[in-house]
Swiss-Prot record:
It catalyses: UMP + ATP = UDP + ADP. Its main location: cytoplasm. NCBIfam families: pyrH_bact (TIGR02075). This is Uridylate kinase. It comes from Rhodopseudomonas palustris (strain ATCC BAA-98 / CGA009).
Amino acid sequence: MAEPIYRRVLVKLSGEYFAGPQDYGIDQATIDRVAGELIAARSLGIEIAVVIGGGNIFRGVEVSARGVSRTTGDTMGMLATVMNCLALAEALQRHGQKARTLAALMMPEVCELYTRAAAEQTLREGGIALLAAGTGNPYFTTDTAAVLRAAEIGAGAVLKATNVDGVYSADPKLDPNAKRFEKLTHSEALAGGYKVMDATAFALARETSLPIIVFSIAEPGSIGAVLSGAGRATVVAG
């Protein structure tokens, strides 16, 4: 395998993926497989931080439509991301990989508070930093949190793990004529309205000149392959 393109990255994982075939909650086999993928990438000498969504457990936007305030709903969603990070941290540790959960909300009995210094220390010491609770503020998605944290810790790129191998002009599962893009600029991604990440995340990535690499997590070895320039992915940069 070729030398990795980046030495420090942030991997953005969807909470929905953690549900596995059951569509809700945490599927342990899926968690273990993701842990294995991250450990394999870490073995290449890459420093890895991770942001996970919480949609497999709770979605604040959906509950706010049923009468709960958006602020409360988003806060509940942040707690779901903490659950996912704790589950992944335990899976990583069980396989011998040091991992540390750092949350944007204070909950000292559960995990440590996120600071850039704590995250960078974890990475330098060979651990995987799991960054929970989004930005710690309502109205911001975990995609935006991923770009923000990546910029803060000096990551070379955000790896956006999805269930398809890049950005398409339409949902390839619904439209057989959907066009797959090898590369897009941040502005093109914003103008195209592609649903792979929200507009705020793309705009922040453009402002900070941070590449976003969109790939399929379903393929074994996909993280390492993408980081070595061998995997199928769409690069959003420039």
